[in-house]
Amino acid sequence: LNFQEHTMAGPLSHIKVLDLSRILAGPWSGQVLADLGADVIKVERPKVGDDTRSWGPPFLKDADGKETRESGYYLSANRGKRSVTVDLNTAEGQEIVRALAAKSDILLENYKVGTLAKFGLDYATFKEINPGLIYCSVTGFGQDGPKAENAAYDFMIQAMGGLMSVTGEMDDLPGGGPQKVGVPIVDLMTGMYTSVAVLAALARRAETGLGDYIDIGMLDVMVGSIANQGMNYLVSGKSPKRNGNKHPNIQPQDVFACADGHIVLVVGNDGQFAKFCEVAGQPEWPADERFATNGARVRNRGVLLPMMEALFLERPMADWATALDAAGVPCSPINTIPQVFEDAQVKHRKMLVDLPHPTAGTVPQIRSPMRFTQAELLFERAPPLLGQHTGEVLAGIGYDEQRIAQLTRDGII
């Protein structure tokens, strides 16, 4: 299989990935692998493609200012890939996927349990033709259990996995009640766990020569990510509650209203609290037994926080930020998304990059946060148009122009 030559020197530039996934969790992992240099082929349905292509507005606009078929959602998770359209319901389409999988290192899929087995595209089949293949299935609930065959989306898994029970304002305050996180955090975490799992399997394959089958369930990821809140319950026997912006285990950490805006204060230890008290003109607080230790501050936050709230209202946000930064006390303004991209640190780290796009001219992308000293991540390929690379990929597995044209006429690609 003649996968496209890469100019990038990413650490995975020798790896070939077949990405049969759609929506976000699987594609996010595929994008992580592509950012690391892997050649990722994204298999999509003819004429329709990944569901997220239509999840808008907003949509990317072409050079004439007209909306394209690429939504902002789709563009967030498919950078660096090549798109191939294949109808998996046909024998010819299944043959194409088997040919691609035979030469791939990793296969990602997130179909409902048992679906790909009906097409002869399951791990048991591929293991016979490519023993080194690492095949990863990403589903809502994993491959077994009473909910294994159920469909799932990020929002419902945030609810089922307990995240919404500890996210949002306290129930007895205005705006209280269950709240989801502002980005699809379960999908993103699932994508990251998927990436870690397949890379671990690659490392093991280097020793054994054998691939593996990996089963990732979104609910498992959510339960495995409730971290301190899960252990808070297991240690205390008490169900954690929503605390708004207040940290359940560390104080003071909260959003404080200033004279002209808001600031986030994150005091992580007793030394930082003492520094805050100097800035706030309250040098006696660190010696007060109610506030001397973090445990005391957590127990007495009902006393401490109202006094702090009154102090913050006395000065503008910029004054607080300048003084706290100078004292080494962690704090931050609450940026809007546009303000994030204008932040001096974000600009210095070059977190935005414009990539060439066949219809829009260029498309902005948020680059990977991973930085290496012995490898370079080059961002060269925009999220692909639907089927943009079908011809070149099929030519790479021996399909001639006549056969490709016939498959196109038949609607198979």
Regions found by a protein language model. Name each.
Residues 2-207, 242, 385, 391-413:
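N-terminal helix-loop segment corresponding to the beta1-alpha1 unit
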Residues 40-43, 325-339, 400-405:
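Short, well-structured beta-strand/strand-turn elements
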Residues 47, 141-142, 218-223, 260, ...:
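Glycine-rich beta-alpha junction loops
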Residues 178-189, 211-213, 243-247, 251-253, ...:
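A short glycine-threonine-serine/GTX helix/turn-capping micro-motif
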Residues 201-241:
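Substrate-binding/catalytic subdomain of NAD(P)-dependent oxidoreductase enzymes
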Residues 249-327, 331:
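Aromatic-enriched alpha-helical interface/lid elements that frame and gate functional surfaces
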Residues 292, 360-406:
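Flexible, small-/acidic-enriched active-site or ligand-binding loops
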Residues 326-380:
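A glycine-rich dinucleotide-binding beta-alpha-beta segment and adjacent secondary-structure elements
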